[in-house]
Swiss-Prot record:
Annotated spans, Disordered: 325-353
Stretches assigned to coiled coil: none
Membrane topology label: Multi-pass membrane protein
Protein name: UDP-galactose transporter
Superkingdom as given in the UniProt entry: Eukaryota
Protein's organism: Schizosaccharomyces pombe (strain 972 / ATCC 24843) (Fission yeast)
Record field: transmembrane: 147-167, 184-204, 215-235, 254-274, 279-299, 302-322
MF term (GO), any: UDP-galactose transmembrane transporter activity
Polar residues composition bias: residue spans: 329-343
InterPro entries hit by this protein: Nuc_sug_transpt
GO CC aspect terms: Golgi membrane
NCBIfam families for the chain: nst
């Protein structure tokens, strides 16, 4: 059954708003630390292997989600419940469904590193906002969700606002890179990552809202199945370098912070798609880019211009338009009877019929 974000509250605050705020803060910190970990002075010849970072990210999520899921299981069944009674919930039933988004998310994470290594930060962030539109398209195709003209307009408005904000960075970005840049490779990687992001996010949302296993069990399954493509990437891409230099080559406190933030983001994203929806998650992520730009004023001598202010206003306007409640359909148009629990979930989220 679908869980409405307004029904679940923490100290009177709907969980969907708490999750979205957490995601915004997490993304803001992640963008700054991840970028700095790749351009940190003094580490030009000691860059960490990104495939190892992706694997550690999934391992951390696996441990955290398994611990919380097992704790909830014992709370519901009884503290005398054994671990072997919990394992069938993870590896039984329809757990195989999570192998699909697990593979997609692993590809997306690795493509992000490829894009970031071949594009300036601004170019990468601008192009990556296409995931908002791909998410909306896949929501329509897979969830049969309807978006009104105003919401479509807000999606394009948001994309334009983010583009304006980030384009001004093209003249101020430090041209630091771990190696030679190839714009064609970078743009190709980010475009494919946007398609994968939209498909994986919506598919995961459908699995979460259309089945019975808890959020934490689903995250355990997702992280577990992600380990296989992560290990395959390490073997195919960085095995010889890791064998020569070690698994943790180039690691420092900033790298670990970036990994922890990315792992925490995966958990927060799951909360967002459980209590809100995937497009709202993308709005939160986009707003966090603006916050990161503001933080760059103090950290990287970023200068606010009129262009930046115009972009901020467009993003705020787009967010207002998307979250504005739509008028309910007239009773004379008939009553929609959902045929599946997913139809009911879509109706709960978007108030469609």
């Amino acid at each position: 059954m679908a869980v409405k974000g307004d029904d679940v509250k923490w100290k009177g605050i709907p969980m969907k708003y708490i999750a979205l705020v957490l995601l915004t803060v997490q993304n803001s910190a992640l963008i700054l630390t991840l970028n700095y970990s790749r351009i940190m002075p003094g580490y030009d010849d000691k860059r960490y292997f990104t495939s190892t970072a992706v694997l550690l990210n999934e391992l951390i999520k696996l441990v955290v989600c398994f611990s919380v899921g097992y704790h909830q299981f014992r709370k519901n069944v009884g503290k005398e419940a054994k671990l072997r009674a919990f394992l069938p919930q993870i590896f039984g039933g329809d757990s195989w469904k999570l192998a699909i988004p697990a593979f997609l998310y692993t590809c997306q994470n690795n493509l992000q590193y490829v894009a970031a290594g071949n594009l300036t930060a601004a170019s990468f962030q601008v192009t990556y906002q296409l995931k908002i539109l791909t998410t909306a398209i896949f929501s329509i195709l897979l969830l049969h969700r309807r978006l009104g003209p105003m919401k479509w307009f807000s999606l394009f408005l948001l994309t334009g606002g983010i583009a304006i904000v980030q384009l001004q960075n093209l003249n101020s970005d430090d041209q630091m890179s771990a190696g030679p840049m190839n714009p064609v490779t970078g743009f190709s990687a980010v475009l494919v990552a946007c398609l994968i992001s939209g498909l994986a996010g919506v598919y995961f949302e459908k699995v979460l809202k259309d089945t019975n296993p808890s959020l934490w069990v689903r995250n355990v399954q997702l992280s577990f199945f992600s380990l296989f493509p992560c290990l395959f990437t390490i073997l195919m891409k960085d095995y010889h370098n890791i064998a020569e230099n070690g698994f943790f080559f180039g690691y420092n406190s900033i790298v670990w912070l970036a990994i922890l933030l990315q792992a925490g983001g995966g958990i927060i994203v799951a909360l967002c798609v459980a209590f809100a929806d995937n497009i709202m998650k993308n709005f939160s992520t986009s707003i966090s880019i603006i916050i990161s730009s503001l933080a760059s004023v103090y950290l990287m001598d970023f200068k606010i211009s009129l262009t930046f202010l115009i972009g901020v206003m467009l993003v705020i306007a787009a967010t207002f338009l998307y979250t504005k409640p739509e008028s309910k359909p007239s009773p004379s148009r008939g009553t929609y009877i959902p045929m599946t629990t997913q139809d009911a979930a879509a109706k709960d989220v978007d108030h469609k019929h």
